[in-house]
Amino acid sequence: MALLCLVYVIAYHALFVGALVAGHLQTHSVLNLTHLVLAVFSAINAWICVCEIALLVHSGAIRREYEGFNAKLGVGHLPPIFLFERASLSQIFSLRYWAVMWSTYSVLDPSYSDTTTFGFCVDVGNGVTTLLPTLLWAAGMTWPILSARLMGAMGIAMYWQELYGTVIYFFQYVFNRRFDRSPRAHVLGIVVPANGIWIACPALGIWASY
């Protein structure tokens, strides 16, 4: 049975965050706002890491889909958002399915359809190098499985990488006036919040790690 992709995404995040919050409450007998925010961010980042691995594996298909969107809809016009289309279980467990995230986002910033750009490389790097640390950090801040020193060192390294990479990406997006190709609503409603999350939450993670 095919459901809206958004249903799967919400269910995944609810299970991920719910498990961490319940574990923290059971272990420490307290709800903590910093833990909650970083639990939500860990869930988001782990999902995006998988999508970023799809960016690497299916870069050629992403380029072809992006060019198809431009030919059909015109430059800067978003196709139907994949989150609101139906998908089967077999599709959502396929890297190929999540590659459409990048062919869609390439309409706003063509960096993701070009393997020579900083945007492509920094996101692939995030996906390949931070998936396992994200999962380990999420578990470690919930259950006492790692020493505080190791958690702090890992958190500072991981979150600094995410923060710095996002700041440089957003700089090149603005400096190269990528926003000129998109309606202001798309820039303010998609690009700015998406990058803002990866600046604000890693900054909080660095503070918590210290």
Model features per residue range: what roles?
Residues 1, 101-120, 179-192:
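Juxtamembrane membrane-interface segments at transmembrane-helix boundaries in membrane proteins
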Residues 137-151:
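Juxtamembrane helix-break-helix junctions at the cytosolic face
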Residues 11-18, 196-208:
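Hydrophobic cores of alpha-helical transmembrane segments in multi-pass inner/ER membrane proteins
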Residues 157-194:
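Juxtamembrane loop segments immediately following a transmembrane helix
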Residues 30-37, 57-106, 177-183:
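Interhelical loop segments of eukaryotic multi-pass membrane proteins
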